[in-house]
């Protein structure tokens, strides 16, 4: 049976939990808002049923269109409803955005992490056969799909250990990628050193 778009009320739609890509209110967003006001949403969103709800949905693809529709005052948007579980949806969220021309280091870092966690969780599921989940490391699968190296994927994921102000500096190119990765190791070491000291102070 062919899946056809369904009009869904805006208030029944929710962003994907842990969505790693920033939806910015910039000139491109303003252009999209104007387009939606004039022509409506030409490409349907992709959504999945929200767990433990009767008629609410989580967005898999189309977060920018959703934001623009809200700002344009649209009450309903067309969407394709797909029966994806959390892990499959997370992978789809990442794969549908990594092709974008401009992606911030922080976006790629959290996207790689989200997909890696989903792939690892799929690998632990007993209802999937070995043919469905290849016996490869999650970072290897991501590297192949994004045409990069396994080490590069790991280094990006390291950035998720940085505190937000430092990660913002990486996005703003005030800190280069390699020093930022090295800094993530340093910060983790400082946390490990300070934690026993802090606990020791409390015990006295």
Where are these regions (language model features)?
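A short linear boundary/processing microfeature
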Residues: 74-75, 83-84, 118, 159, ...
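Short linear Ser/Thr-Pro motifs
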Residues: 35, 149, 202-203
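Single conserved hydrophobic/aromatic residue that forms the stacking wall/gate
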Residues: 191-204
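Alpha-helical interaction elements
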Residues: 100-186, 191
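Base-recognition residues in the alpha-helical recognition helix of bacterial helix-turn-helix
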Residues: 64, 155, 200
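Short, charged/polar connector segments at secondary-structure boundaries
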Residues: 1-82, 88-102
